[in-house]
Amino acid sequence: MSETQEFWLISAPNLPGADIFDQVNQKTAKENSLSENKKFNTPALRVGTLNSLITLNDELQKIDTIVESTTKKIARQLVDLVGTKPGKDKSLSINGHTIPQYLQQFAWDDAKYNLKLSLQEIVEKISSAVSKIDDDLKIKSSEYSTLSSSVASEERKASGNLQVRTLNDLITADNIVQTDYFTTAFVVIPKQSEKEFLACYETISDFVLGRSAKRVAQDNDYFLYSVILFKKFYENFKTKIIEKKWVVRDFKLEDNKPTQERSKLTEDKKNCRTSLIRWCRLNFPEAFMAWVHLKVVRVFVESVLRFGIPFNFQAILMKPQKGADKKVRDILFDQFKYLGSAHISGKNETDDSEKFYPYISVSVNWEN
């Protein structure tokens, strides 16, 4: 069973002569062992105008949700393919680091998201890149799903009883007589009806070749027999067999081709699976890093809007211990309530909505 691993990115303004991180760490980690904390360095991004920040802030949470969804879809796809939990699969690493290590050692990728770009340009770049990854995932996973369904369908055909299963791998050219005048009928009968069938098949219809019945295959409940007769009486023979509650399986020699097609489908599925695993392992880090960079933009934008400029705030990465969320939130509330009750609308820390915190709080939730 997977567990949700939650990280918080919080932010609060620095105070003269006080280290915000030390204060938070003292009360949540050193004194109470409720959380693992790490200073989180946010870069000096371009602020732009107040209106542009407000507009961008309205868009960020929606984009965040979309990017998160794509990132987790890639991880789930890989889990489905290899059967390994997302947090346990070593292939789900970020430049050789585990997910917690990457978050704790985060450094802004200036080569990919140049700090000279505006915030809007950075967000658009992230959104565009992840959108393409998502489109590629849909195409590749759809292809694999289609192949899997086709293979499963063929396997079902080959695994049923003789009344319904494919006969492609049971009947060979040696079982068939096919000339201008003669044809071969394939009859499925219950095992308990074998004696009755052998006693009557020669006379059940006109122009059935005597002593032509040969057992071709059997399963737990049925026998498959071949019978040679004149072509023009095939339909009459079939009708008489059906009247006996037996089954005639229509089959032509060229129907053997699906056996080769099934083998090809199986091979295609195997190759597609290998390709999709490789793609997921290459693109998961790209999507995850884009997601975390977007979280950083969110923290920066909300901090500037909340605390003003020149910006002088400290971001902290927190990983609360399991079951300690409320206690940590209560400590943070007491620590930062001086920032103003206007930000919490009279609500206390039992409400887990980010907008009610007097400090900035952005969550990074991950299943492992």
From Swiss-Prot:
Query: What Pfam families does the record tag this protein with?
Result: V-ATPase_C (PF03223)
Q: Which GO terms describe its molecular function?
A: proton-transporting ATPase activity, rotational mechanism
Source domain of life: Eukaryota
Q: Which UniProt keywords apply?
A: Hydrogen ion transport, Ion transport, Transport
Gene Ontology CC: contractile vacuolar membrane; early endosome; lysosome; pathogen-containing vacuole; vacuolar proton-transporting V-type ATPase, V1 domain
Q: Which InterPro entries match?
A: ATPase_V1-cplx_csu (IPR004907), Vac_ATP_synth_c_sf (IPR036132)
Described by its record, this protein's role is as follows:
Subunit of the peripheral V1 complex of vacuolar ATPase. Subunit C is necessary for the assembly of the catalytic sector of the enzyme and is likely to have a specific function in its catalytic activity. V-ATPase is responsible for acidifying a variety of intracellular compartments in eukaryotic cells.
**Which family does the record assign?**
Belongs to the V-ATPase C subunit family.
Quaternary structure note: V-ATPase is a heteromultimeric enzyme composed of a peripheral catalytic V1 complex (components A to H) attached to an integral membrane V0 proton pore complex (components: a, c, c', c'' and d).
What is the protein name for this chain?
Answer: V-type proton ATPase subunit C
Please give the organism.
Dictyostelium discoideum (Social amoeba)
